[in-house]
Amino acid sequence: SFFLSVISIRPLGTPISSLMAWLEILKDKQVDDDILKEIDKDISRLNTITERFSKIGSQPELYPENLYQQLSNIMDYLKTRISRKIEITCNFSPEQELYIPLSASLFSWVIENLVRNSVDSIENNPGIISINVSESDKDVIIDVSDNGKGIPKSKQKTIFNPGYTTKKRGWGLGLSLSKRIVEYYHKGKLVLKSSDPKKLTIFRITLKK
């Protein structure tokens, strides 16, 4: 069950609080500022993960968020954590504005998961991951594409099933949970639009404005 994730994540709260206290102590010990900043980033990241999983067990509140700013923030975070051989491109700028109802923490997890899947598909080769946004009168479409190895046709109908994974480690919940977040919590759609190793693999998110 997805809700088991909530149970397993709750014990993180206490060690995170402890880490925050230790960080304050280290600040008084004249530890290098760069080290403290990295520790602070990691604690913030753990807090974000805890927040995301705590929302999965109940219907999260959706607030008007600038989609372009959200996507830009995610891209900035991921660019420093993936291979330099991989380029992340987009067809928008953070200065653009498009406000739609979102649970920002859960939505960012979906995009991160799709991008990380693209990174895995590209493997150690040079590659391009694109995040492109288009609009209609009522909907917003977000395409996440890559030029990696693609998904075999025999697997394309089951990729959203719990347990599907191409990794040696992991529970295979990524795409299944992403679909649940988009479709159950945001009332949108997440589909595999196409996958061709000679061209592109494209995942499409459709959200209401």
What are these regions (language model features)?
Residues 128-138:
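Short beta-strand/loop element within the Bergerat-fold HATPase_c
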Residues 182-183:
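Detector for a conserved hydrophobic position within an alpha-helical segment of the HATPase_c
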Residues 151-162:
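Short conserved segment of the HATPase_c
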Residues 87-98:
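Conserved catalytic submotifs in the C-terminal HATPase_c
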